[in-house]
Amino acid sequence: MIQSKIRIRTKNQSYNVIVGNNLIKDLLKILKNNSISFNKCLLVIDNKVPKKFINKINFLLKKKNKFTYTFNSSEINKSQKTIDKLLDILLKKNFHRTDCLISIGGGITGDVSSFTASIFKRGIKFINIPTTLLAQ
């Protein structure tokens, strides 16, 4: 498997973008190698993502306290209502800035998830697992 790491540097922080094929099997190694740790995570999942894929991620994250929100990633759901639902879950489950939101799906899933992660408590950790070429 070919894997590339791209270092993104901004004025306030820097982070890695990992690009490759079938990286899911190496998810825990990638998290460890990039010093990404968290106790709780919210998985935001496009309902078109195959169950086999989701089961693999759930298995890999079995030791984590995780919650799931699955939705139809259509333009109509790229909305404040969806963002409010995600924020409500994060609040009710007592997420902290050290916890994580993981997006699994296409562009709409990534857009809604990344925005939510950026505004919750001034930003929580965000991992995007794109399942479409356009979402990358």
Label each PLM-derived region with a short phrase.
Residues 1-100:
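ATP/NTP phosphate-donor binding region
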Residues 78-136:
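Glycine/threonine-rich beta-strand-loop-alpha-helix active-site module
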